[in-house]
Curated annotation (Swiss-Prot):
NCBIfam families: PRK00092.1-2. Keywords: Cytoplasm, Ribosome biogenesis. It comes from Brevibacillus brevis (strain 47 / JCM 6285 / NBRC 100599). The lineage of its organism: Bacteria, Bacillati, Bacillota, Bacilli, Bacillales. The keyword Cytoplasm applies. InterPro entries: Ribosome_maturation_RimP, RimP_C, RimP_C_sf, RimP_N, RimP_N_sf. It is found in: Cytoplasm. This is Ribosome maturation factor RimP.
Length: 152
């Protein structure tokens, strides 16, 4: 997590929770000559709508303008995490059991660093991912990125 995303996370988590939503992820990155602060929100049902995004965007914009934690000009975007939402917290992995996931690891496991298949179980920081021909057990510490996956 970058310094900016760490500071922004602390500032905006209470705002998102105050309106009954969950902060899923924050992304701060440069694309071309522009900086973007992307805030991904969700709720228990996974049904975020444009009104939720607008409400959070207005509240965040006000707070960010007041505190001004970002040294450069940027575009603020608030959205749902989408169908391929990132998996970061224990509850994200628990909710994803029985669904398809895409995992990349920091180091190879049995020669591979990318795994895509059904998350069969998640327990004590260990994921069991079943691909078409093989099942892997991956510890959370080994994960570089994890997200939901749509497999055709």
């Amino acid at each position: 997590m970058s310094k900016v995303t760490g500071i922004v996370t602390e500032l905006i988590t209470p705002i998102v929770e105050e309106v009954g939503l969950e902060l899923v992820d924050i992304e701060y990155k440069k694309e071309g000559s522009n900086w973007f602060l992307r805030v991904f929100i969700d709720n228990e049902t996974g049904n975020i709508d444009i009104d939720d995004c607008r409400l959070v965007s207005e509240k965040l914009s006000e707070k960010l303008d007041e505190v001004d934690p970002i040294p450069t000009a940027y575009f603020l975007e608030v959205s749902s995490p989408g169908a391929e939402r990132p998996l970061r917290k224990d509850k994200d992995f628990t909710k994803a059991v029985g669904r398809n996931v895409h995992i990349t690891t920091k180091e190879p496991i049995e020669g591979a660093t990318t795994f895509e298949g059904e998350l069969v179980s998640y327990e004590d920081g260990k994921l069991t991912v079943k691909e078409a021909k093989k099942t892997y057990v991956i510890s959370q510490e080994q994960i570089d990125t994890a997200r939901m996956a749509i497999i055709f």
